[in-house]
Amino acid sequence: MIYMLDTNIIIYLMKNRPKIIAERVSQLLPNDRLVMSFITYAELIKGAFGSQNYEQSIRAIELLTERVNVLYPNEQICLHYGKWANTLKKQGRPIGNNDLWFACHALSLNAVLITHNVKEFQRITDLQWQDWTK
């Protein structure tokens, strides 16, 4: 199984709070993969540039990416994005742009999106998601 961690889950994992996130990671099967979208990676880098200790933040991100692969766009992401951006707009229930990209990236890989932001992602009925903070 592919598990795509969104930004809030990655930050929880890096801070080891709540501890249940690390516990869930330790319970994964050998063939399971932890990945993050390039958008999550960009958000982490943005945070590092805004932090008081840039070098320490970048090093923490580098260590993280040794375990959690960064995945980059493919055509399928765009197809899912076009579908869901219009579907949600017609329903009058759009979600944030980055969240929509996360969801579409996970859909393109048939991955489970791991998030604490379930309210937004519940709107995308094709998406598999889990909240590992519970």
UniProtKB/Swiss-Prot annotation:
Positions contributing to Mg(2+) binding: 6, 99
Coiled coil (UniProt feature): none
Gene (UniProt): vapC1
Family: Belongs to the PINc/VapC protein family.
Required co-factors: Mg(2+)
Molecular function GO terms recorded: magnesium ion binding; RNA endonuclease activity
UniProt key word Electron transport: no
Pfam families documented for this protein: PIN (PF01850)
Keyword terms: Hydrolase, Magnesium, Metal-binding, Nuclease, Toxin-antitoxin system
Enzyme Commission number: 3.1.-.-
The protein's name: Ribonuclease VapC1
Enzyme category, top tier: hydrolase
InterPro entries (UniProt xref): PIN-like_dom_sf, PIN_dom, Type_II_TA_system_RNase, VapC_family
Functional note: Toxic component of a type II toxin-antitoxin (TA) system. Acts as an RNase, its toxic effect is neutralized by VapB1 antitoxin.
Residue ranges of every copy of the PINc domain listed in the record: 3-132
